[in-house]
């Protein structure tokens, strides 16, 4: 059974680059929930949405590798460019190394221009069951 599409975090094209980075793409259309109230006269993607997209890229790539990853914080985040409805974003995150905790750099770009960048703290939930496409194995 396919995983239903997430209307808040509609990531697509998840991949691992030849350099080992985790990437995904997203295009938030004008009807996206993220634009509700932000701002009616000139819709903009909120910064928190960009952080949520980086977080979700880590979580989904972790699941692909059978790891349950969470993001517990951000540091050094800089927002460099406004993002408008319909623009495609590329989210790129340093891959999670072996171990239970790491700081990973992330970049969000649009048309090759930096939108946001910084560092996120990722942790692996230890003692969890391996993850499959239908949930946790053994449950």
Where do the model's predicted regions map?
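Residue-level signal for inorganic ion chemistry
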Residues: 47, 93
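Short, solvent-exposed secondary-structure boundary motifs
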Residues: 1-7, 82-87
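Catalytic strand-loop segment that frames the active site of acyl-thioester-processing enzymes
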Residues: 3-45
């Amino acid at each position: 059974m396919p995983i239903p599409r997430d209307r808040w975090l509609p990531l697509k094209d998840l991949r691992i680059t030849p350099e080992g980075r985790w990437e995904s793409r997203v295009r938030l259309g004008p009807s996206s929930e993220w634009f509700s109230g932000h701002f009616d006269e000139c819709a903009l993607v909120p910064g928190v949405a960009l952080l949520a997209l980086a977080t979700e890229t880590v979580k989904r790539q972790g699941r692909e590798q059978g790891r349950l990853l969470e993001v517990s914080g951000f540091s050094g985040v800089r927002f460099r460019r406004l993002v408008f409805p319909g623009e495609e974003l590329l989210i790129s995150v340093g891959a999670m190394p072996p171990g239970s905790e790491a700081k990973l750099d992330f970049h969000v770009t649009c048309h090759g221009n930096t939108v946001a960048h910084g560092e996120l703290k990722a942790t692996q939930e230890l003692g969890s069951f391996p993850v499959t496409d239908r949930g946790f194995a053994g449950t």
